[in-house]
Curated annotation (Swiss-Prot):
SUPFAM superfamilies: Protein kinase-like (PK-like). The keyword Kinase applies. The gene is ckb-1. One of its GO terms (biological process) is phosphatidylethanolamine biosynthetic process. InterPro entries: Kinase-like_dom_sf. It is an enzyme of class 2 (transferase). This is Choline kinase B1. Its EC number is 2.7.1.32.
Length: 371
């Protein structure tokens, strides 16, 4: 734990120590009226919902600029990527302004907004709006490696799991009843799953690589109070990947609900997994927005939409394999965010094997040109 995270973990938001620290940040990075602010004029409010960060809204009764203080909990590589992406999107008007960054955190513009939740993300109109906002982010050229990252991240996660002493993994689903999965999976077999999913992806979708969010759950989408515009936030997993992986990641996560405070802290809906209600509308909105952005008149819009639906369905189980590999290691690390990581990993593995045959069929159909 970094010293700054330890400081904000051990001291209450209304403590003198925290008040003095946020005034110091205000003076250092914003200047202006913060130089004259007194401690009794400052309010620090904890913002709930961040698993990767501690977040605080800092305001004063004066004209000093309010700000959002973000204290990182992630490792250096995630923090670096998130900060780079945040700065780029800030400069291009696609996110909050960056006020400053320091070892272990940053200060940014506070956008009066609501965070979408697991219920509203299922609203057909909101789902269409999310689909329509994606293309402008996918069109950005970000100065990082253009190599697709998702499969390498899976391998890195498995290696970390093994380095922590992890071995063969039992799969006993808790919130889903799918039964296509093996009862136990070896690390060698998991690496093989990753390898052939990567092989299929290389053969079919190598020309669809764009810059992706890779973690667009509802909690990472803001709706601005002033304009109702949707803004994508929290880019620590941002990297280049196939666009279908990014879109399927969002769609698959609409079936996962993390709001239950009782164990295991996650519920995956089989109904929303097997019959996603907004897949058609979401893909229509994406295709229309993408064509508009590129000033392109589609020769066959229906075919474009159908192909994108097929693309999303292909990657759907791959997103579950991605998160299952990632959270296995968190379980060994006793990562505490209110979610049982072993339950999450096992349920996601069950979803992966349940949907794997559909992906195999899509692969075979696309190779034959019949999908």
């Amino acid at each position: 734990m970094r010293p700054i995270e330890k400081f904000f973990t051990e001291n209450a938001p209304d403590s003198d120590l925290v008040i003095e620290k946020v005034i110091e940040f205000g003076i250092d990075f914003l200047g202006g009226e913060w130089k004259n602010v007194k401690k009794n004029e400052v309010k620090v409010t904890t913002i709930l919902g961040g698993q990767s960060n501690h977040m605080f809204h800092v305001t004063s009764s004066t004209s000093a600029t309010p700000y959002l203080l973000r204290i990182h909990r992630q490792g250096p590589s995630h923090v670096f990527m998130d900060t780079v992406n945040f700065a780029i999107f800030s400069e291009r008007g696609l996110g909050p302004k960056l006020y400053g960054f320091f070892d272990g955190g940053r200060m940014e513009e506070f956008l009066p907004s609501r965070t979408l939740d697991s219920d509203c993300i299922l609203d057909p109109e909101i789902s269409r709006r999310v689909g329509a906002v994606y293309p402008k982010y996918h069109a950005i050229d970000v100065p990082v490696s253009k190599k697709r990252r998702c499969f390498q991240v899976m391998r890195e996660s498995l290696k970390e799991y093994q380095d922590l002493g992890g071995g063969d993994y039992e799969i006993k689903p808790t919130t889903v009843t799918y039964s296509e999965h093996p009862k136990k999976i070896s690390m060698d077999d998991l690496y093989k799953e990753i390898d052939f999913m990567e092989k299929w992806t290389n053969e079919l979708f190598e020309d669809t690589v764009v810059f992706c969010h890779n973690d667009l759950a509802s909690s990472n989408i803001l709706e601005l109070n002033s304009t109702k515009e949707l803004v994508l936030i929290d880019w620590e997993f941002g990297s280049y990947n196939c666009r279908g992986f990014d879109l399927a990641m969002h769609l698959a996560e609409t079936a996962a609900d993390f709001r239950d405070s009782t164990p295991p802290g996650i519920r995956i809906s089989e109904e929303l997994t097997d019959n996603p209600p907004n897949l058609q509308g979401f893909c229509e909105a994406y295709v229309d927005a993408d064509n508009k952005l590129k000033n392109r008149v589609p020769s066959n819009r229906d075919l474009e939409v159908s192909n994108l639906i097929c693309e999303c369905q292909f990657f759907w189980p791959i997103t579950q394999l991605f998160w299952a590999c990632f959270v296995m290691k968190l379980a060994l690390l006793k990562y505490n965010c209110g979610v049982d990581m072993d339950v999450q990993a096992q349920d996601r593995f069950a979803v992966y094997w349940h949907l794997k045959e559909r992906t195999r069929k899509i692969y075979e159909d696309l190779k034959k040109g019949t999908c």
